[in-house]
Amino acid sequence: MSKFKEGNLEAPTRHPLNWKDKDFYDEDALNNELERVFDICHGCRRCVSLCKSFPTLFDLIDESETFEVDGVDKADYKKVVDQCYLCDLCYMSKCPYVPPHDWNVDFPHLMLRAKAIQFKKGETKLSHKVLTSPQKVGAIASKPIISPVVNWSNKNKTLRKVTQKVLGVHENAVVPTYHSKGLSKVFVEESIESQFKVAIFGTCYGEYNDPKTVIDLVDVLRHNNVEVRLIKKTQCCGMPKMELGDLDSVVKYANENIEPLMELVNDGYKLIAPIPSCVLMFKNELPMILHENINIKAISDAFFDPFEYLSLLIENNHFDDKFKAIDKEILYQVACHQRVQNIGAHTKKILGLIPDLDVNIAERCSGHDGTYGVRKETHTYSVKIGMPVAKKITDNTDLVVSDCVMAGNHVAHIASQEIDSIHPISLVKLAYDL
């Protein structure tokens, strides 16, 4: 008899991703595991509202001859896999059968395994490979001669139709702006003597698309007498490639990042990234993939979400809470990849310290989810997923705020009214009157 009760009251644990195991890429073994897990999901259906994967699975079952998983053609399993964008919410917030439960369900990592097999078989579209290469694309698109053309073409309806055909970017999807003066060019070194030392992993998005938000983070940290450095010569965190199933690239990027990050960790620096997905990658995912690497564990322990670090300053009486009033009403969308870090509601807590700021919270997925929200095959679904958040915007809402700027931009874009979106750290900077 199982020692675990229905619903699993034990604290969830997670097993390492055994991607080097010979059975990991065995398609028959994969299909057997998919059938087992799909049957468990079929009997539960608690996750039906999270994303498109689960409705796709349940529709396949309900429309089969047997009304069971055994009636679903295994060739159709791919339809379920393709709708998963590895948000991790099912594992962290819904599933009652995650380890240590006997049934050992890890739906996201099972989907990752399926994606990895698809990638190994050469079934991944070239356009998807391009879209999951933000560092390479950003390095080209942000060149001084090229960035004005790229930004102009992204606002041209006719050219967006061409981009949809060639690159698979949906013509109505919000796409980022590229800056020729990226983060590494606008960051200014400043010497501060402090026991609190932070090194910022700028991220691909911060370097090429949104350097302002990262500089806002730098300004807030320095205002609180924190020594801040920008980490030079880093690779992409690997999250986009992981969502593609390209584990070889994930490991390659990680190995290239380990040395510069470990140098800083050994020098006593904490690490921060402005994008929740990048933080999640270093905190949670890479330790599961490179579980034998002790340096990855040390890097994971040193990595902080920006507001998690500000909370650390509060605990150490090293945080300035003398904010000016901001008379605005905001919709704060809690980013999925921040939620699943299980670090607590630090952003909400600190925004609550700002006088007169009215914070309305939407703890639901934005639907953006990396490339899912921009691809022509899935953009329509992303709008549907994010619409419950967008509907929370009222005539009184002044701003959409999200720790994931891309998620916030997506919500603002699909809303029925024009509204701006910013990172919450920019609100904190405003409240400091910097």
Task: Name every feature range the model reports, one short phrase each.
Residues M1-S2, N154:
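Polybasic, low-complexity association/targeting segments
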Residues V105-L434:
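Iron-sulfur cluster-binding electron-transfer modules in prokaryotic oxidoreductases
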Residues A29-E33, D76, K252-Y253, I385:
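Short, glycine/acidic-rich beta->alpha junctions
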Residues N18-H42, V72-D73:
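Asp/Glu-centered strand-loop micro-motifs enriched in Gly/Pro and often flanked by an aromatic residue
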Residues H15-N18, E27, L60-I61, G71, ...:
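A short alpha-helix capping/helix-coil boundary motif
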Residues E33-F54, D76-D102, A114, V137-A141, ...:
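Cysteine-centered iron-sulfur cluster-binding motifs in ferredoxin-type domains/subunits
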Residues S2, E6-F24, S49-Y85, Y97-H128, ...:
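Non-heme iron-sulfur electron-transfer modules
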Residues S2-N8, D28-I40, C47, N172-F187:
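Short N-terminal secondary-structure initiator segments
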